[in-house]
Amino acid sequence: MTTLYIDADACPVKSEAERVATRLRLPMVLVCNGGLRPPANPLVSLVIVPEGPDAADQWIAAHCGPGDVVVTTDLPLADRCLKAGAQVVQPDGEVLTPANIGPRLATRDLMQDIRAADPFHQGRGGGFGKAERARFLQSLDRVMAAAQRIG
């Protein structure tokens, strides 16, 4: 059965993802290292991992597989999930695939190097609003439908 995993620390689309999971009657797992209230929705579970670098990422990567969907902005986690057979959607609605994750990781690494070399370099830092939420919902619907055919 398809499960929706959310890298929940600082995820801006938890409520939108919950609406989709509820409509499709599929389980959703919020994974974080604290700070979230247990959900009232019986389809949504909360996994609190120990404090530490990448603990939530490690848990998600260990539990997701073919037919599952992961929502994250973390590109190394996305890469691990894709290799495990899961599908990945970013909160802005971008769908990550085995074909586009390599260039995305390379760009991420390049930007880290630029920021390290130039402390005054400013990132794009765009806002997150209705358009991004709408794009996320469209992408999540499409990816969840495909995942259900697999799972």
Curated annotation (Swiss-Prot):
Highest taxon in the source lineage: Bacteria
Protein name: UPF0178 protein Pden_1915
Annotated family: Belongs to the UPF0178 family.
HAMAP family: UPF0178
PANTHER family membership: UPF0178 PROTEIN YAII (PTHR35146:SF1)
Organism: Paracoccus denitrificans (strain Pd 1222)
InterPro entries referenced in this protein's UniProt entry, alphabetically: UPF0178
